[in-house]
């Protein structure tokens, strides 16, 4: 039996607490790291790897496909709000967030996070794990 709540708790420890404000984990040109929220100039920020806009508990929209999010049960009104960021990574994600900072309600953020986590675990992680048995 999969202990989803235990996995989600672990993810929150790794990814950080749930956040309703979209951000991109970045390196700063002036040194160090910081999350970019779209409210300041992008010139001092460089996305870590292929990071995209992240929200909830580690839901990186740059790594997502709309069809998967829909299949996993993300509500249509949430998809409408996150659509501009889906699939965008690095510089493209920074520009999109700069032009339109993202904030979801707590209910929307929780719905997105749970649907993405359950969907990813059920369709990717568990089948991969089962192949190893």
Where are these regions (language model features)?
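Acidic, aromatic-lined catalytic clefts of primarily extracellular/periplasmic carbohydrate-active enzymes
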Residues: 1-133
């Amino acid at each position: 039996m999969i202990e989803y709540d235990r996995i989600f708790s672990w993810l929150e420890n790794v990814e950080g607490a749930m956040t309703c404000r979209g951000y991109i984990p970045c390196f700063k040109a002036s040194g160090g790291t910081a999350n970019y929220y779209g409210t300041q100039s992008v010139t001092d920020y460089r996305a870590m790897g292929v990071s995209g806009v992240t929200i909830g508990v580690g839901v990186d929209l740059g790594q997502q496909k709309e069809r998967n999010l829909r299949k996993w049960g993300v509500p249509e009104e949430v998809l409408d709000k996150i659509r501009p960021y889906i699939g965008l990574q690095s510089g493209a994600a920074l520009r999109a967030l700069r032009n339109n900072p993202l904030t979801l309600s707590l209910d929307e953020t929780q719905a997105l996070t749970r649907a993405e986590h359950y969907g990813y675990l059920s369709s990717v992680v568990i089948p991969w794990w089962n192949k190893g048995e």
